[in-house]
Amino acid sequence: MEHQLLCCEVETIRRAYPDANLLNDRVLRAMLKAEETCAPSVSYFKCVQKEVLPSMRKIVATWMLEVCEEQKCEEEVFPLAMNYLDRFLSLEPVKKSRLQLLGATCMFVASKMKETIPLTAEKLCIYTDNSIRPEELLQMELLLVNKLKWNLAALTPHDFIEHFLSKMPEAEENKQIIRKHAQTFVALCATDVKFISNPPSMVAAGSVVAAVQGLNLRSPNSFLSYYRLTRFLSRVIKCDPDCLRACQEQIEALLESSLRQAQQNMDPKAAEEEEEEEEEVDLACTPTDVRDVDI
């Protein structure tokens, strides 16, 4: 009996307590200064890639998001993996047959950076229907980290969300709801190539504004009003309020199109009928009414 082991392991992952020192203005200023150092090129499809197209990136990004969701990865893993993918594609031409291998490798490395128990190479190969082997993934990992010069601690929009929420004089229950919705918007933005041109702080601020706008939360001090929040966050990230507003509108448009696409995938017959109706409307009307032209 005296040699029995006492097992105290628990299934839940232990996390550090929130540290207010990590959310002060000095840290945020340093993050805003550093965010551009790990930004991908906005024109790599034109200048670097010969086979890979934006539509292919979208397919791989959607697959990566599904894998991360099914494996219940930390929220930061997917945006960080997409940062690696875009930065690698900014530097190195990739054959379209190797794009899924690159996506799996990016998740593999991002998971090591952010997870307590990272994804294994074998598990990621299973998600590719065993079209790649663990040895290939490990070789690609070496190529990836070398091309990125081992600069793997890239800033993502998730790193900024907590800073913004800490500065908002709101109840914790409201912040929890805003945080969850903003994280969803960040993941959605990572799947769309149009958001590569926006810095992480802008995407994070736009996601918070879009979350508040969509949730329609009531605030006793009216801080959550659209105008006040936009002005406040634009001052925090030192950008023009109109730029932040444009980013937020882009996010809402992306959400709308994604919901529409999901609905069409669930009901293809309804989608066909909708397309037929749109064609009939297009045929029935003229492109521009001359009475609307101001001469």
Swiss-Prot record:
Residue stretches of biased makeup (Acidic residues): 272-282
GO biological process: cell division; DNA damage response; endoplasmic reticulum unfolded protein response; fat cell differentiation; G1/S transition of mitotic cell cycle; lactation; liver regeneration; mammary gland alveolus development
Listed PROSITE patterns: CYCLINS (PS00292)
Keyword NAD: no
SMART domains hit by this protein: CYCLIN (SM00385), Cyclin_C (SM01332)
Residues of the Cyclin N-terminal domain: 28-152
Function of the protein: Regulatory component of the cyclin D1-CDK4 (DC) complex that phosphorylates and inhibits members of the retinoblastoma (RB) protein family including RB1 and regulates the cell-cycle during G(1)/S transition. Phosphorylation of RB1 allows dissociation of the transcription factor E2F from the RB/E2F complex and the subsequent transcription of E2F target genes which are responsible for the progression through the G(1) phase. Hypophosphorylates RB1 in early G(1) phase. Cyclin D-CDK4 complexes are major integrators of various mitogenenic and antimitogenic signals.
Oligomeric form and interacting partners: Interacts with either CDK4 or CDK6 protein kinase to form a serine/threonine kinase holoenzyme complex. The cyclin subunit imparts substrate specificity to the complex. Component of the ternary complex CCND1/CDK4/CDKN1B required for nuclear translocation and modulation of CDK4-mediated kinase activity. Interacts directly with CDKN1B. Can form similar complexes with either CDKN1A or CDKN2A. Interacts with UHRF2; the interaction ubiquitinates CCND1 and appears to occur independently of phosphorylation. Interacts with USP2.
Protein name, entry field: G1/S-specific cyclin-D1
Gene that this sequence comes from: CCND1
